[in-house]
């Protein structure tokens, strides 16, 4: 590929407004960084096709630095993939999308400030993003205050669509209780009845811990103990060394760099040899596998997305998505990792928004209520927009339910053990919207 072609690709991938700072370039190759800088001055080649059509402004807040940076960067790739594909195919309602990116630095206070800037200064029409659950929780009231639609794209904390729900926020993928009810029967029925949980000690880890305690008990098992480990802990040994006793399996709830840390250190301490080893699939995301090596062998996890072309995922639409994602991920990681669930859910979140905007004839902020009504009950059919599978965005709480994949790592690769249909993951709504 020529330098000119590379620049064009990155021009399309990074068409957003803002200054190019050193922080924005962290994690990109020098060639890609150069191309990124160029796009601040040169519009994407397809932009001219829209003439004078006013672009929709979509804000996306992601952790591009700090504890969540590794996942935040792949999440951003998913957003960009969808936006570029939409713009190349004629936009939404004949208008292009302009993407405005904010780095929340993996900090709730920074995230809230950045979201307020997106809404007040950048004047975005809608927002798609949110990675760390504590940041999602901090920002949700802001979207409600300014009456702007917020499509959550990674955060899994249970309360986002239950006790802390609001009319302006939607989650078009799974959440902690759905994963737990899908996985607990396998854990108890095929691996062991007594479990010990180690978890990331913040909103997501805590709500996921609670969900598994409940569902393992319902399945006939027992959680005999749990230990929280602060987010970003580089040396987990002082915590892991406290884990001992008579139980069958160790269950981990971690992601990103912390997933690599516990995978390696639990192995080194002999915990994954002494006990069955299972957990949230984020521990063994495709982007983590190289750093885990053979220490993750035999791990059993659950995830909404696994990058394999087998069974129900052996479809033309999934192959197209996976191949496209590998090309885009290679631009930030030369090893060309397979896509993770963050790429998938962000890609599909943008596409869900597109459907809602088309259905409502959305023009801008003045049509926010029309957009909300279009998104409530939105049916998303498996295909190029939604390669993960069918889903419906429930009207009562803005929560979707999707099929889940139980998998293990065999010879360094993903192997699907069970596919749990979305119908088996459904919980009754537990949300009361405040009148707007």
Named regions from a protein language model:
Residues 104, 151, 158, 231, ...:
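Venus flytrap/periplasmic-binding-protein-like
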Residues 113, 158-159, 166-269, 312-320:
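Extracellular/periplasmic Venus flytrap/periplasmic-binding protein
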Residues 1-24, 33-39:
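N-terminal secretory signal peptides
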Residues 40-67:
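C-terminal segment of N-terminal export signals and the immediately downstream linker at the start
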Residues 328-343, 354-416, 436:
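Segments of small-molecule ligand-sensing domains
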Residues 266-347, 360-362, 420-435:
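Extracellular/periplasmic periplasmic-binding protein-like sensory domains
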Residues 53, 70-77, 90-162, 172, ...:
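Beta-alpha junction/loop-to-helix N-cap segments that form part of ligand/metal-binding clefts
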Residues 118, 122-131, 151-153, 196-199, ...:
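Periplasmic-binding protein-like
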